[in-house]
């Protein structure tokens, strides 16, 4: 009995680099080198950037393996950062963070209490005074999360009891997305006094352009926070299970059924691409909530839109400049990032990936509609195209 088991183990391959595996480490079969790399990355809060397109070859025969892609591969195959025992911080923490699951952040800065019902991040007032917009966004986001608990509460559910996340169908995803439009627009007005003072038509242009990418980007960010990249998290806390798209599209309320083969051909590549280009890089960067707010600010105040006025362009430029200055202060004084410019560039580089991912999904839906391959509701098309 012992002999065959030993023999089988010899031939197991590391899920990351294809070297001979040493055993099951942090949720995946891995060699000693990849397990040590993952442990060092998580425990030391290391961040990496890829010089390519986040798709480098990380097999053992590569001489200078891309560390960013190696870490992404670790996450892809199931390695869980929460499984790495964290070092105790050397001094009293400056920032208290509580979230659904612990993320990988600087241990000398952040502490992780028991998970509460929503994501909250607090910094001392001496720092928040230097980050007025970002701190206001954090406070209003907490209000948004609490409002969502009420809005998306199931009939008869206790508002004080945490929702147990479960997979949703596309009909429920539409319902949650459309319900969240008004809440999100209110959140934007709470965050930015300048937005509140814009004319109605300028508000509509900015918000309609930003909502769908934001909806997808937030889902990817919350997936990163939960360490479940295969789950695109919805506003309610429920999620789209990208490993079971058949149940997502072929729900009992569907207007028309579609085969698993067609789902894999039409929709799976777009979902996989979004995870690989957005969610996994967020996990690799260990993106935090303030950095997410910066991404949303840049997404909302898109001064390249041809429909917006010169005044709106001027206001948007001013807001983005201020927020980037606050991010620089945050990185230098709170997170203690050694190279804040490099990290900022890597974070901002996520925006094109978000936009491309959303456009790819929109294109797929348009193809299914034009060629009558799948009949989704008008609400679904409108939500994904920003027409609401």
Curated annotation (Swiss-Prot):
The record's keywords, sorted A to Z, are: DNA-binding, Metal-binding, Nucleus, Receptor, Transcription, Transcription regulation, Zinc, Zinc-finger
GO BP annotations of the record are: regulation of transcription by RNA polymerase II
Alphabetical list of InterPro entries matching this protein: HNF4-like_DBD, NHR-like_dom_sf, Nucl_hrmn_rcpt_lig-bd, Znf_hrmn_rcpt, Znf_NHR/GATA
Q: Which residues bind DNA?
A: 11-86
According to its UniProt record, where is this protein mainly located?
Answer: nucleus
- Where are zinc fingers of the kind NR C4-type found along the chain? 14-34, 50-74
Where is the NR LBD domain positioned along the sequence?
115-387
Listed Pfam families: Hormone_recep (PF00104), zf-C4 (PF00105)
* PROSITE patterns cross-referenced by the UniProt entry: NR_LBD (PS51843), NUCLEAR_REC_DBD_1 (PS00031), NUCLEAR_REC_DBD_2 (PS51030)
Gene Ontology CC entries for this record: nucleus
Q: Where in the cell is it found?
A: Nucleus
Please give one Gene Ontology molecular function term for this protein. Answer: zinc ion binding
Task: State the family it belongs to.
Answer: Belongs to the nuclear hormone receptor family.
What does the function comment of this entry state? Orphan nuclear receptor.
Q: What protein name applies here? A: Nuclear hormone receptor family member nhr-16
Q: What organism, scientifically named, is this protein from?
A: Caenorhabditis elegans
Protein's gene: nhr-16
């Amino acid at each position: 009995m012992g002999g065959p088991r030993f023999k089988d183990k010899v031939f197991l391959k590391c899920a990351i680099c294809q070297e001979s595996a040493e055993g099951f480490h942090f949720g995946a079969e891995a060699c000693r080198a990849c397990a040590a790399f993952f442990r060092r990355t998580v425990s030391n809060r290391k961040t990496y950037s890829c010089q390519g397109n986040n798709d480098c070859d990380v097999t053992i025969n590569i001489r200078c393996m891309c560390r960013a892609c190696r870490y992404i591969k670790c996450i892809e195959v199931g390695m869980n950062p929460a499984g790495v025992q964290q070092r105790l911080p050397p001094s009293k923490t400056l920032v208290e963070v509580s979230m659904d699951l612990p993320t990988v952040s600087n241990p000398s800065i952040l502490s992780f209490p028991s998970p509460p019902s929503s994501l909250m991040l607090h910094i001392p007032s001496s720092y928040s005074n230097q980050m007025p917009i970002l701190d206001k966004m954090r406070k209003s986001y907490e209000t948004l999360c609490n409002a969502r608990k009420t809005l998306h509460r199931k009939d008869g559910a206790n508002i004080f009891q945490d929702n147990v996340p479960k997979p949703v169908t596309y009909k429920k995803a539409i319902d949650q997305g459309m319900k969240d439009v008004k809440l999100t627009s209110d959140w934007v007005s709470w965050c930015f006094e300048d937005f509140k003072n814009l004319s109605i038509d300028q508000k509509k242009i900015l918000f309609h352009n930003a909502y769908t990418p934001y909806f997808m980007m937030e889902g990817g960010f919350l997936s990163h926070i939960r360490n479940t990249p295969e789950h695109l998290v919805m506003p309610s806390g429920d999620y789209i299970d990208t490993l079971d798209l058949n149940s997502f599209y072929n729900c009992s309320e569907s207007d028309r059924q579609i085969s698993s083969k067609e789902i894999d051909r039409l929709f799976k590549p777009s979902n996989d691409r979004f995870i690989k280009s957005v969610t996994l890089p967020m996990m690799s960067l260990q993106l935090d909530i303030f950095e997410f707010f910066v991404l949303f600010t840049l997404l909302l105040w898109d001064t390249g839109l041809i429909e917006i006025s010169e005044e709106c362009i001027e206001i948007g430029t001013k807001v983005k400049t201020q927020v980037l200055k606050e991010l620089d202060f945050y990185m230098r004084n709170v997170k203690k990032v050694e190279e804040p410019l490099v990290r900022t560039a890597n974070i901002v580089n996520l925006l094109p990936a978000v936009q491309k991912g959303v456009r790819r999904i929109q294109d797929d839906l348009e193809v299914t509609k034009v060629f009558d391959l799948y009949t989704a509701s008008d609400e679904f098309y409108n939500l994904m195209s920003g027409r609401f």
